[in-house]
Every structure is written in structure tokens, then in C-alpha cells.
Amino acid sequence: MWSNVISIGKEYSKEIDYILAQLQCTKDVSYATEESEQRMWIYLASSCENVQQIENEMYRILSVVFLSFLKLRFFLERLPIHCMSYAKCVLISSMLHFDEAFEENLIAKTLSDSMDYNVDGLFNFRLRMLKESWEEIADVAARLLEGSDGDKDVFDIATFIAGSEGGKSRIATDGQTIDNITQRRRVEIVRLYDESEYNLIDAIVKEKPFEIYVTNKNLSDAMRGILKKIAKVIEKI
């Protein structure tokens, strides 16, 4: 029998909701929760024959927690963003997914070397190297934002941070779901924001598309406009 435990401070309510929702959809894993006034523990168990599969899934789930939820908190605390906009969402998404492959590998290595999954403990101590790198990106973005004038400047900053790497995938969205046509898979849309279109932007930026098929006429004008700045848009309505 394989077992482990995820522990996390209860102030991270969105992170907890995400972890529990993902565990409900994970095959061959049973779990139980325990909580105190300040902390939650999620006890995990599975048969030994599925250990590698289950651990890989835990790494994937916790990678999203570290590299989307906690990274977003980190940047919002350091950037002069007083009112969110579509352009600012693109900027933050570019920052969240910058150097993502390297960071995901680092997360997996850190988790594999850990006795348990103490989320905030790992984030504050074992992953300090990541936070130092994020601090540098946040400093650059903050300086550029202070001198920005409107959404065009904000989007230019996002393009600068994302680098010159070209788009990799053709994707399609109906405003509720996203499919990566090139890789033939459904794209996960993580609920980072209360505004659903911001979550859509984050998932789209992560895919690095060169072409976006839009099949929903009900997307807002602001959303349509920002998609056209991210990649070539083809409307199929």
C-alpha cells in the first residue's frame, strides 16, 4: 500500500479547493481529510502497483498549485496592478508560464525527495530558488509597468517577457473549453480568477498558440480583441 499526506494552511482556500477537486477525478486513489483551525491534512492511499502513476499525478496537481496559484499570489503582491484588465491578465499569464518546463521538473524533483507534501513548507523553504527567480521577473515587470501608458504598453511588456519563441499549437475554444488541436488533448482551465474569461486567457497563453479557432459568438469584445493580439484568430460561428 502506498500512502502520503498533503498538508497546507487553510488560508490557501483556492488551492485546497483545486486539490480536492482534482483528487475526486483521480483514479485508484482514496483520500480523507483532517483539519485544525489553521491547517488541513489530506491523507492519500493507493495500491502499490499504481505507485508511479499516482505519484506522477500528485506531481502534476501540486505543480499547478505551486506554478499557478502560489506563483500568481507571489506576483500580485509585487506588481502595481490596482485593477485587473485583459491586457494585464495576458502579462501575468506570460509571467506565470515563463520557463514552465524547467520549473515543473524542479517541482517534481523536490516532491520526489520529500517525505510528504507540505505545500507551504516546501514553497517557503525548499523552493526558495524559484522564488528568487520570480522576484527578478517581478522587479522587471514592475519597473516597466510604472512607466506604461495603457493596454498597448502592458501587452508589449507581456510580449517582452514571453520572449521571441513562436507559437507551437493550434487551439480551439467555445468560451467554456479549450482543445489543443495540434496535440489532440483537452486543455485544463484552472480557476485562478473570479472572471471566467481571465481563466480562459491564462490557459490559452500557457498553450503558446499560433492559431485560435473561436466557436462562440458570445465572447466579449474585449476577449476577442485580446485573442487577436495573442495569435491569429479564425472565427467559426
Where are these regions (language model features)?
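Conserved mixed alpha/beta catalytic, RNA-binding, or beta-rich assembly cores of soluble enzyme
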Residues: M1-I204
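C-terminal structured domains
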Residues: I181-I237
